Amino acid sequence: MYSLGDDQEAGFKARDSQNTPSLDRARLFAAGPVLAPKSVDEAKKLVDDNVAMNVDIIKIRVDDNLGTTAKMPPDIYKAVIDEAHRKGKRVAVHLFYLEDAKGVLDAGADFIAHSVRDKDVDDAFIAMMKRRNVCYCPTLMREVSTFVYESTPSWFSDPLFLKHVDPKTIEQLKEPARQEQMKNSKQAQRYKAGLEVANRNLKKLSDAGVPIAMGTDTGPPARFQGYFEQMELEMMVKAGLTSRQSLIASTRDAARCQKLDDQVGTLEPNKWADFVVLNADPLADISNIRKIDAVYVAGNKVDR
């Protein structure tokens, strides 16, 4: 699990204790606090603070939340990226708009942490991504979570989902007043439209050879870890990727994108034996990723 932001001390302790052959839980890599500096000087200081925490990557937000907040200006995000690179750290960027994506790439960003959702990507953006071999993490289920609770999702009756979710959370999300509020939310409907753009952009970028890393933005309330990852692969296939491409984006290429491919991502000698055993072929039907027989971490069977 690669957490892109606001990780607490316990997360770093978990990360620092995971390089052991006896590990029987998920691996964790962490970005620490998401940086939101107000000046160039503060940008440098916050980067230095995160580096002192020994974060795995630096995370920033370049987004105005659909026009409701101020966006980090280019001089400041460039200062973050430059300082991070001086200290040997890569930078992941939360964004929404195509022009911001181009701007952060110009500034040297290393990882695009969400889909471009305001418009279709163009040839110039694709060329920038490929020239620097920057990875793109679509987080399609993040968009789904912003509007789907305007009604009761079908998966609320899935036994696999219900096995691990807090029933109180389900009841809250099924409240008629809450669903009506989301249905009438202009922001939710904007993100719903953004999902269609995100789907097209994922397919276009994948076809062009841009490296894709599966991610979901799970963790916040109503973004269900584990289950949303399974749904993300299904969403990627619905967007036009093959089952094989979605699986590679979730394993080998995700590891490559985070510079972890010497440890995980494929089953090879001298790497950790982290893998899932399924009861059906996901290449034949991507929904077969739900048919889990066993999970192994470092070759150890995880108690499920």
Predicted regions and their residues:
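Short acidic active-site motifs
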Residues: 42-46, 99-101, 121-125, 262-265
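Loop/turn elements at helix/coil->beta-strand transitions in domains of secreted/extracellular proteins
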Residues: 23-27, 53-57, 85-90, 108, ...
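Acidic, glycine-enriched loop/beta-strand segments at the rims
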Residues: 196, 224, 242-247, 256-292
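Divalent metal-dependent hydrolysis catalytic cores, especially in the metallo-beta-lactamase
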Residues: 1-13, 25-33, 53-66, 90, ...
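Divalent metal-coordination and catalytic microenvironments
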Residues: 28, 54, 84, 94, ...
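Alpha-helix-loop-beta-strand connector modules within alpha/beta enzyme cores
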Residues: 16-34, 71-93, 129, 133-138
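Active-site neighborhoods of metal-dependent hydrolases
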Residues: 38, 45-68, 116-239
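Active-site gating/metal-coordination segments in enzymes
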Residues: 32-82, 103-106, 111
